[in-house]
Amino acid sequence: MIAACALGGLMASPAFAQEPAPAPTRQELAGKPWMNTHLSAAERTQLVLKEMTQEEKLRLVMGYFGTDLDGKHYKRPKESLHQSAGFVYGVPRLGIPNQWQTDAGVGVASQRGPNVRERTSLPSGMNTAATWNPEVGFAGGAMIGAEARSSGFNEMLAGGVNLVREPRNGRNFEYGGEDPLLAGTIVGAQIKGIQSNHIISTLKHYALNDQETGRNFLNVEVDDAAARMSDLLAFQIANEQGQPGSVMCSYNRVDGIYACENPYLLNEVLKGDWGFKGFVMSDWGATHSTVQAANNGLDQQSGVPFDKSRYFGDALGEAVANGWVPQKRLDDMAGRVLYAMFEHKLIDDPVTGPKNNIDFAAHAKVTQNDAEEGMVLLKNDNALLPIKAGLKKIAIIGSHADVGVLSGGGSSQVYPVGGMAVKGLGPDSFPGPTVYFPSSPLKAIQARAGNAKVTFNDGSDPAAAARLAAASDLVIVFAHQWTAEAFDVPNLSLPDNQDALIAAVAKANPHTAVVLETGGAVLMPWLKDVGAVLEAWYPGTSGGEAIGRVLFGEVNPSGHLPITFPASEQQLPRPVLDGDPKKPELRFDVNYSEGAAVGYKWFDLKGLKPLFPFGYGLSYTSFSHDGLAAHWADGQLTVSFTIKNTGAVAGKDVAQVYVASPKGLWEAPKRLGAFQKLALKPGESRKVSVKVDPRLLAMYQSKDKTWKIASGEYQVTVAKSALDPQASVTVKLPATTVDVNGK
């Protein structure tokens, strides 16, 4: 979504804003046939549709921005919630509530302004993906969904599952990484958690919206099979596991057609092949037509006044009256909105306005657990971490670590309970401001450091920081990379001369640990000179406490990378980012010539050695994987093995199962086929059994819309990362065909 500050134009007060008739009470509605909870959502939808007027149907497919736009001649609907993302009128006489929409994937966001909501923020989506734990995804989703409901919202624009094809993408921090199985599983679990609160979650940004530069104008070129085995597979898995009520189509074009009027994406794949029964909503400003958009699968225009025109509403009514859009299609559009509302109990268990009864202390523990489980220990020479007792002087340097932790920017921005830790940071317009959550790593470290003197230096003067480092027993440098919606980073280097700062500090004291607060991968020219590196991502509301607990060993790090960290930008499929950020209206093509070879698959295919591979993550303990076996029966590959904690402390292991086809059959040498995360005490062992989705063993066949597994010997490997195999076996698979959904 795009925020108010980025708008250039438009629009007066909303249509359909006349006073509605007084809503009947729930008791008065109880006898209506569509209120019978024993009927299916589909049956109830058809019953209530028959009672609706044409205008009421048109109401359901037109959404408005929930924030006033000063100087733009737009006032939000009075029924909307202030500084919110969106609002859709319901049909109160029939018991159909309004839709109150809030961004986004890490919590209840607010549009920038004087009266922001202060809410709990999860860590970044990238952090949650790095947990490799769907239970963590579900718990976080359930928590932010509860806050949304308590804040008066019944729809969250959460569920970003765009694959990380482009490491410089400013929104990567919102997403679930580069692998379709991992991303789809984690995001699907989060959607399920959100919707457990009887609200709708939104799978987005559909599809192939993998960079911010030129996002409104670029055209993605990729063939059907490649998309089905990569980006679309991530959406397919998230849809299957999360069952979202809505899907948000994206800004970009795909094969020359805008995503929000693209019949291939919306009608053929999403609604046809996958059987999606909910509704498709546009991103804010992503609708471009009336007839084409409606007929090609868009069900709801969102975010008036961001589009150039009100394409739905009166214009859609005229198109139906003239036969340009069939009446049956309008009924389908409104029916899909109603279906989602019935299916996810927005009608049976309606929100009743903001309650502000949030248990922030309890929710802080949920987000803290997510942060702790997603942090990735990338280097730990000579067991520099966890921090040992008996140190006399500890230096903490950089990135406002004295007061808080960084978050990602844009429409997903959650404003912290207690206010921003650092005031006055830009940008002054969208996607700003830069927000630090008031959870101080320095205070968390001081609380655990015993009699050690803990000194903070802001890092603005590398020479002064180096002098402090030289006089300290241990140095912890906090480094940051702010990323946000609406722009991509120019390169993967840390900004603000931080590489020079880290190099100077490490030269002064080799007992230096670096804590990274980044949206994704960064380069590390100083890596060989530091003792330890902890990737903390954007760690959310309780991030400072979580960092302190991991640094001191109260929590054993168990995160594993959901993306590849390249050694240089020259290793990427596109070393230079397509498009020109200085010419945002330039139309251009982005050719995904790598096809389905995204992330680690590209590195495997080209024989490239990354800085850190996909799936990588160290621990304060050690694990072994033994007894690997693979068995094919009844069209299903099952893999089993035993994990043992061979170290001295408790920890969690992420066992990764990779599968490799007979040579040359796939887009890359191997694919992630399954994964399992387990907590084990020292000396404890446990047998694990996982199943590999048949689609991950197959090639997609566009001609007949099937997945075909070729007969032959397949290699099955249990590994600690994409480049760290522990054991391998071969298994003979027969030629097998499954349908478009892997059945």
Where are these regions (language model features)?
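Gram-negative bacterial Sec-dependent N-terminal signal peptides
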Residues: 1-16
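Glycoside hydrolase catalytic-domain context in secreted enzymes
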Residues: 18-699, 706-723, 742
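Short beta-strand elements
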Residues: 725-740
